[in-house]
Amino acid sequence: PTPIGMEAAGVIEELGAGVTDFKVGDRVAYASRPLGSYSEARVFPTENLVKIPDDISDETAAAIMLKGMTAEYLIRRTYKVSAGQTVLFHAAAGGVGLIACQWLKALGATIIGTVGSNEKAELAKANGCEHTILYKEENFVDIVKDITNGVGVPVVYDSVGKDTALLSLDCLSPLGFLVIFGNSSGNAPPIEPGLLAAKGSLYVTRPTLFNYNDTREKLI
């Protein structure tokens, strides 16, 4: 048996000895271990808590922490997107994708997003995605090359994995980054270093949130 759940929001009811950064009554949220967020009340380390701003509801905070922090480290730290760049984001209508599309749009980037249905295409567009591709029906490599006039994109964010990872390499411009952060279709296949050289001195990384937020300073 094990506790379940790692993302929640709530109100501090009691503080342990030596806690100075929080007070009883503070609204807080977290998306980290130890597991157990499905409980009604629990003891939790304050170094993993974040105060909730007054204009954000508990429900929104609980739902957005993991996805929002994931979007942040992907587009601001793993590969820092700049205004004017065009990026490819797989699963653009997913939880992380919708947040990332809004953020990337605000940064001045152009987003190409793959989606699984026409309904998801409309949702992605409503959240800032300029170009959508039905990746199960269309050749996303050809479409990305067409949109970028054959140049490719500097970064691909891929949470799909097996079905898209190798093809994503063909969407990159020289020195481009493939950021694999999920595996909804299965694990991405092994990639030979020589293939990266042949396709333009490319980079591949497989980041996780917990390495990016493993200290209090990084979290806040």
Segments the model singles out, each with a brief description of its role:
Residues 29, 88, 154-157, 179:
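N-terminal Rossmann-like NAD(P) cofactor-binding module of classical short-chain dehydrogenase/reductase
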Residues 15-17, 33-34, 47, 92, ...:
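Short, surface-exposed secondary-structure boundary micro-motifs
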Residues 139-150:
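Short amphipathic alpha-helix with an adjacent loop that forms part of the alpha/beta core around
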Residues 64-138:
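Mid-domain Rossmann-like dinucleotide-binding core that forms the NAD(H)/NADP(H) cofactor-binding site
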